[in-house]
Amino acid sequence: REAGAYAEYTYAIKDKFSIVAGLRGDYNHYYDRFFLTPRGHLKWNITPSTTLRASGGLGYRSTNVITDNIGVLATGRAITFLDNESGKFDFRKFDRMEKALTVGGSLTQTFGLVNPGDATLSFDYFRTQFYNSVVADQEMYADRIVFYDTDGRSYTDTYQIDFSWSPVERLDIFATFRYTDSEMTIRRADGGTARVERPLVSKYKTLLNIQYATKFRRWVFDATAQLNGPARIPTQTGDLDDSYYSPRYPMFFAQVSRKVGKFDIYAGCENIADYRQKDPILNAQDPYDYKFNSMNVWGPLMGRKFYVGLRFNLY
């Protein structure tokens, strides 16, 4: 059971500036605790073509440790829960309440390359700082996965650049690049700690999408190219020196659609280059051994896929 209240204050200067500040309070019966979660949003139209946005907020989340980490059931390892106070394996004293602060903002600029206002460039930055988080650690021991809560240094910084351009009528070009710096503190079997990159998180991703539509959007042609950067693969031996990175890999997609009355007929292809992760299941021949592991998937498992479809629009 939970009871809460929320208050919000808004200040605005029409078409120029607005700020929203909010405060929420909740009492949770299960945890027998009262939680305060402040948040705020700001928008400033510096010029008619330049907009600055900022936001921040504190949040809590009660984790469902198994369903949130369902991949742990796809391994041959034992699953244990570690109590912070005693250092023993005890689920009853396991704190499942996560706490994090997210702050960030964006700057958007509209300008003309061929025609006035035909292009938009935006820069985004967001940081999430975790003050308490639940970790499913598969790197402490080789034969088990250990769940524990930690207040060690853990954060995610995300930088993103978006560019959109419509050089001619009905032709849209969109490109984006995102860089992620994500680290977490994990425990070691000797009682110490180590700060490592968050596993299975790509360091960067970039995407290019080009779409062209004929008059009245009778035909729509769409093509997308994507490059996925490397991600750290967690060690399977308990020794952090044995961890490695996945390769960067491309993905290509294409689709064409035809509008006929209220129907849209479309056909396309996913993963055109037929790229697939090799050997995604470790020790597949012995599923009852602790070395069996199918949770470290960093790339596509399905190859090239063609599809056709029919969509009906009611309105």
Predicted segments, located by residue:
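C-terminal beta-signal and adjacent terminal beta-strands/loops
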Residues: 227-234, 257-315
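Outer-membrane beta-barrel translocator domains and adjoining extracellular loop/strand segments
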Residues: 31-38, 65-71, 78-82, 132-142, ...
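Transmembrane beta-strands of outer-membrane beta-barrel pores
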Residues: 3, 23-29, 56-62, 71, ...
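Membrane-embedded beta-barrel scaffold of Gram-negative outer-membrane proteins
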Residues: 45, 53, 90-149, 155
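Gram-negative outer-membrane beta-barrel transporters
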Residues: 12, 120-130, 149-236, 311-313
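Residues on the lipid-exposed face of transmembrane beta-strands in outer-membrane beta-barrel proteins
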Residues: 5-11, 40-44, 105-109, 161-165, ...
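Surface-exposed extracellular loop regions of Gram-negative outer-membrane beta-barrel proteins
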Residues: 1-29, 33-43, 165, 170-181
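Repeated loop/turn-to-beta-strand initiation elements of outer-membrane beta-barrel proteins
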Residues: 16-19, 49-52, 113-121, 169-173, ...
